[in-house]
């Protein structure tokens, strides 16, 4: 049987798309602001 393609890692996910990672770049901050404007319950993944 073939190996499953998605083998998620919590650490990798947070490093890529966590709150601190989003705050680092201007684009990431705009993502957070747009999610706040939309009224999302969760602003980021973690």
Swiss-Prot record:
InterPro entries: Ribosomal_bL34, Ribosomal_bL34_CS. Keywords: Chloroplast, Plastid, Ribonucleoprotein, Ribosomal protein. Its main location: plastid. It holds the Pfam family Ribosomal_L34. GO terms for biological process: translation. GO terms for molecular function: structural constituent of ribosome. It is found in: Plastid, Chloroplast. One of its GO terms (cellular component) is ribosome. Signal peptide: none annotated. Transmembrane segments: none annotated. The keyword Disulfide bond does not apply. HAMAP family: Ribosomal_bL34. Belongs to the bacterial ribosomal protein bL34 family. This is Large ribosomal subunit protein bL34c.
